[in-house]
Amino acid sequence: MGINRAEQSLVINAPPAACFDAIVDFESYPDWQDAVISAEVLDHYDHGLGRRVQLRVDAKFREVVYTLHYQYERPERLWWDFVEGDGVEHIDGEYVFEPLDGGRRTRATYRLGVDPGVPVPGFIFRKLNDGVMRRSIKDTKAEVERRAGS
């Protein structure tokens, strides 16, 4: 089917470091990321951040389980590549955190590439993917602002 790519951005009322800290707290995802059923850090880098993370996600058209390999440029960016999965052929993406207003706020940009591995009409896949991404970035905004007391 090929990789479908999408992007969502919004402004979060917290500094980039607060955004970064929330998004790398993988094992808390089920508490605040609506689509995430479970998240497990399989191994860590020496600096403590998760290297490989297994996620179980309600992707609306089916439940999928996959492992991603993460890399970091703290606190501006993190990105991931597909390792293996059941219910999906490929996932890659990134979060970029751009400081605004002297670092008091952040423009968060979420980019995602997905190959579901099964034939899904493009317009349906785009609608599902757009909804999942929009929900995910809004969940991120709510959690970061909750943690920051904004």
Question: Which residue ranges define each predicted feature?
Answer:
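Beta-strand/loop substructures that line and gate deep hydrophobic ligand-binding cavities in soluble
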Residues: 82-135
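Solvent-exposed residues in well-ordered beta-strands and their adjoining turns
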Residues: 11-15, 56-60, 71-73, 83, ...
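Conserved beta-strand segments that form the floor/walls of ligand-binding pockets within enzyme
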Residues: 5, 11, 79, 96, ...
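Hydrophobic ligand-binding cavity/cleft-lining segments
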Residues: 1-48, 150
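Conserved short hydrophobic patches within well-ordered secondary structure
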Residues: 23-26, 36, 53-55, 70, ...
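Well-ordered beta-strand positions in beta-sheet-rich domains
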Residues: 7-11, 65-69, 92-94
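Glycine-rich portal/gate segments that line the openings of hydrophobic small-molecule binding cavities
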Residues: 30, 40-88, 107, 135-150
